């Protein structure tokens, strides 16, 4: 059984002005997502600024989300690290809290070989044998690209490595991955502008930044495709492209947090080294939000 089908939000982590995590606001965001048909919550991923959290904050935020969601939708916890030992520790803790699955990014900076990636993911999976793992491939951010044969080896040989969040942007590579891994692989788009192409390759949904500001529309796009209304799904995908482009005109999550603040959601600042959005880009973002029909505060 798939971890989820449809639209999973890579949710932001709201902050107070002093940079501390705003758990009251996080609860509001979780309720907003669930009320608007979100199919899964992905907590402490790239969009959640996990890379600037302490381990204590990271784990507290994961536990908070799991407890507040309370099984209404799956909660997938980001527990990846470029240190295998740290990833194992984070994964074991998240599993003990009741995470429905783990999202584990490829190791970054230290440039593991494909052999090293197999060892890394196998060690993590063996430490949490009852918890499903989704691998996360985003080479533009990590400098590490997990190859199709490596994905296939892992999903075929490690029982709880089940999925891939594909954010390479390379549809040929993704198609080859599907070809090699076959039915063993649960595939999710990691790029909001490639949802329908990846669904057409057998994908089950999207782990989405766009969903922070447009959860219902993103959910509807995936559902329409799965129900056979490809024209309806394509219209949503095409209509969303200007907004998606605006949400990535600076590095994620700068634009999406800015967008939520423009919408009156008051998610607070970013943590350094991320910084406030350029004013010219903010104006582009405002227009894209309004053109998509999103009301600003």
Show which residues each predicted segment covers.
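Short, amphipathic alpha-helical "lid/cap" segments that border enzyme active or binding sites
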Residues: 23, 27-30, 148, 282, ...
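Glycine-rich phosphate-binding "P-loop"
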Residues: 137-138, 160-161, 271-272
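A general structural signal for well-ordered alpha-helical segments in protein cores
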Residues: 26, 58, 62, 87, ...
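Gly/Ser/Thr-rich beta-alpha loop segments that engage phosphate groups in nucleotides
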Residues: 8, 47-50, 80-82, 165, ...
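Catalytic alpha/beta core domains of metabolic enzymes, predominantly
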Residues: 127-128, 141-248
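C-terminal alpha-helical cap/extension of soluble enzyme domains
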Residues: 8-14, 36-38, 200, 207-297
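Active-site beta->alpha loop and helix N-cap motifs at the rims of alpha/beta catalytic domains
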Residues: 2-9, 13-145, 153
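Catalytic cores of TIM-barrel enzymes
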Residues: 2-3, 36, 176-179, 260
């Amino acid at each position: 059984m798939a971890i989820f089908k449809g639209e999973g939000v890579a949710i932001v982590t709201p902050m107070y002005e002093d940079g501390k995590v705003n758990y009251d606001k996080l609860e509001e965001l979780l309720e907003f997502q669930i009320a608007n048909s979100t199919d899964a919550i992905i907590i402490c991923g790239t969009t959640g600024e996990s890379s600037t959290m302490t381990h204590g904050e990271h784990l507290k935020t994961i536990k908070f989300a799991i407890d507040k969601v309370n099984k209404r939708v799956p909660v997938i916890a980001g527990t990846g690290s470029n240190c295998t030992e740290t990833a194992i520790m984070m994964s074991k803790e998240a599993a003990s809290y009741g995470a429905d699955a783990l999202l584990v990014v490829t190791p970054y900076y230290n440039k593991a070989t494909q052999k090293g990636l197999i060892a890394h993911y196998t060690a993590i999976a063996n430490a949490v044998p009852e918890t499903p793992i989704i691998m996360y491939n985003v080479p533009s951010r990590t400098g590490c690209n997990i190859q199709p044969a490596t994905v296939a080896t892992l999903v075929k040989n490690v029982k709880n490595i089940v999925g891939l969040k594909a954010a390479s942007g390379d549809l040929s590579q993704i198609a080859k991955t599907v070809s090699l891994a076959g039915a063993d692989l649960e595939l999710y788009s990691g790029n909001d502008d490639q949802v329908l192409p990846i669904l057409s390759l057998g994908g089950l949904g999207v782990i989405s930044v766009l969903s922070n500001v447009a959860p219902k529309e993103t959910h509807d796009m995936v559902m329409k495709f799965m129900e056979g209304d490809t024209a309806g799904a394509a219209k949503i995908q095409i209509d969303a492209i200007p907004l998606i482009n605006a949400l990535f005109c600076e590095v994620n999550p700068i634009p999406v947090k800015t967008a939520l603040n423009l919408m009156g959601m008051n998610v607070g600042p970013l943590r350094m080294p991320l910084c406030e959005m350029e004013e010219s880009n903010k104006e582009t973002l405002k227009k894209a939000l309004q053109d998509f029909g999103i009301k600003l505060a």
